[in-house]
Amino acid sequence: MTGESKLEDRRMQREQGDVNTTPNRRKYWERNLSPEARRWFEEDARYFLHQSLSTPVLNVLAGAEGIYIRDLDGKRFIDMHGNGVHNAGFNNPEVIAAIRRQLDEGLTFCPRRYTNIPAIQLAKKLAEITPAGLCRSLFCPGGSEAIEMALTLARQVTGRFKTISFWDSFHGAGFGSAGIGGEEHFHGGLGPMMPGSFHVEFPNYYRNPWGFDREEDVDAECLRQIELVLRREPEMSAIIGEPISATPVVPSRRYWEGVQDLCRRYGALLIFDEIIEGFGRTGKMFASEHFVTPDVLVLGKSLGGGVLPFAGIVTHEHYNTLQHRSIGHYTHEKNALCAAAALAEIEFIETRRLADHSAALGAYTLQRLNQMQERHPMIGHVAGLGLHIGIDLIKDRATKERAVDEAEIIMFKCLERGLSFKTIDGNVLTLRPALVITREEMDRALDILEEAIDEVERGQSY
């Protein structure tokens, strides 16, 4: 790798969230980790295969409960990331109890060609709670595999192989799922990926390459791009995207209605990746309820109750035509333990009305953040739905230059105060807490965040 390519690779890593190898990470490690934690830190570095975004680690965890993670030294952090698995809260007692009951019943694995009651009950439950018309499920161990099942289904039922997805999107780390993803970080250096994978711009109303200010203009240009590809590439099997991007960017309903119309006109399936956004995150049980019903809905992460790895797809009866093909065929396709965890998590979210809670608390959080934006010029833009929120930090409101270094310092200052979150694109602070978070806990988190922003704006380093 040349010196120039190394610099480019480093720039890409910083923009896509890798703060684990910077001098500030080293300072955090020296200031906050005990000798015992440092010993395990070094063991982790010695035995795991190193990779960007997760090596070296930030800390060593010993526990998690509700909205909190706890490190080896006993310090608790309000966790606003959770890798998207923690909608019902970490170590949810009802999910744990359901798993224990299933363990006690003695069915922990279901061989192929057999079924079991928890798996059937889960498929039935998903048919009841997903948007109208979605009624056929298939399960697998993780989100990457679920994305690839959706792609396989689209190829089989359309007889086509090409896809449209979005630049800067992430749909998993598997070869196929990374191939349709739009993050260079996950396919750089791998050579040819999935053939027929086309990418277009996502409708970002704050940052778009054309400098448009009106949502209608951004939507129109993004839809024009999609139709241009569809006209020139007739073998299109599907358009795949998150209803709301992970950043998050919240498109208009008009935009997704336009995409769905193009899919119908050109014979492609619409696949929604709700691996992060499903199960109450955006203020509705599924993010697609804000927009349109897709042909295939992809679920994962919190589907396993925050305990077990589990994912799947839900689609329409119309596409239940591939009895002569294998779409997933995973060893743990109908895992009874995972199904029991998923059922308990869904019941917990429903009985406690966590989707409604997410909508109400999310609106309050956005209101507070908008007030903070008036006081802090570094906050360029705030966006989100429910408890799926992003804060775009900038150096200058006229140029919208990304405040990458400042965002990193703010993150480490917040960690020292007991607040954990993830940065995306180098400068966007993402807030995705467990849905059980209270207003008082959210206020505490926002107070910590504002303290850190204020210090950085006044010129304090880390």
Q: Which residues does each PLM region occupy?
A:
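Conserved N-terminal phosphate-binding loop of PLP-dependent enzymes in the Aspartate aminotransferase
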Residues: 7-462
